[in-house]
Amino acid sequence: MNIKINEYYIPTSLSGPYGITAGIDEALWFTENKANKIGRITVKGEIEEYLVPSQDAGLSIIVSGTNGDLWFSEYNANKIGKITIKGEIVEYSIPTADSGPFGITEGPDGAIWFTELTGNKIGRISNLGEVIEYKLPNDSSYPSSIVCGSDGVLWFTENQGNKIGKITMLGEITEYTIPTIGSGPVGITSGPDGALWFVEINGNRIGRITTEGIINEYDLKTVKARPHAIITGSDGALWFTQWGSNQIGRITTSGEVSEYEIPTANSEPHGIAVGPDKAIWFAEECNKIGQLILL
């Protein structure tokens, strides 16, 4: 497969871009972990930035809601933030102190669901900012990323618990153990085949779990690739960032893996998303936003 990668510098130096998502405004929105800003980039590479009110908020993952608002996690500030496409920001405090909010997604109920890394809970926040929390069965599970599955249930990774969990709209939790010990699952996404696909940052594998809980794992070609985030591409394959090897990876639903080198050395790719142009967009902690175009 032929591809082309473009990279766009962020105006604020040392901004530390981390999470990225596509908005309803034909642009991509991303978090700037070090600059404490939310960024917006058009498919032509034009960038705007918005400062978050809470200082050193620890901006992490960002997701677009169906009503157009962008929601993001503030790991250090212990808040969930919301920004409109006009740049207006509101922040909501989480009841559990030092909960470490990280992964975030929209649920089938229209609410925003998120993980609490250190709080060991899954949270739900309404559009009005009302928060409900559900404690996980096992301590120190370190719930990381979360996504809505094809079955209408929220699925999440347990980075330290070495499990994939799911939670219903009623707060009922089920967990499935990953075969590889200490795999360190992080990113998770709903695949084109109806299954959930996730990355193993320590196991150096891509995992697949059916909605019935059956797990398969696929080895990556590059050792110590440290896969971080994953998304379903417009081509029907899964795309993921390889933070350790400075690559963007691709895996088909049959398990065939390809890897593509990022032009900038040591770019530290993290978040990944599909843009309105159907390209793969990703956040590089080296202060750039990348765009991978399928030729």
Swiss-Prot record:
GO molecular function term, any single one: carbon-oxygen lyase activity
Residues annotated to bind substrate: 228
InterPro entries hit by this protein: Streptogrm_lyase, Vgb, WD40/YVTN_repeat-like_dom_sf
Xref: Pfam families: Vgb_lyase (PF24684)
Catalytic center residues: 270 (proton acceptor)
List of residues binding Mg(2+): 268, 285
An annotated GO BP: antibiotic catabolic process
Co-factor requirement: Mg(2+)
EC number(s) stated in the UniProt entry for this protein: 4.2.99.-
Function: Inactivates the type B streptogramin antibiotics by linearizing the lactone ring at the ester linkage, generating a free phenylglycine carboxylate and converting the threonyl moiety into 2-amino-butenoic acid.
Assembly mode: Monomer.
Similarity comment: Belongs to the Vgb family.
Name assigned to this protein: Virginiamycin B lyase
Native source species: Clostridium beijerinckii (strain ATCC 51743 / NCIMB 8052) (Clostridium acetobutylicum)
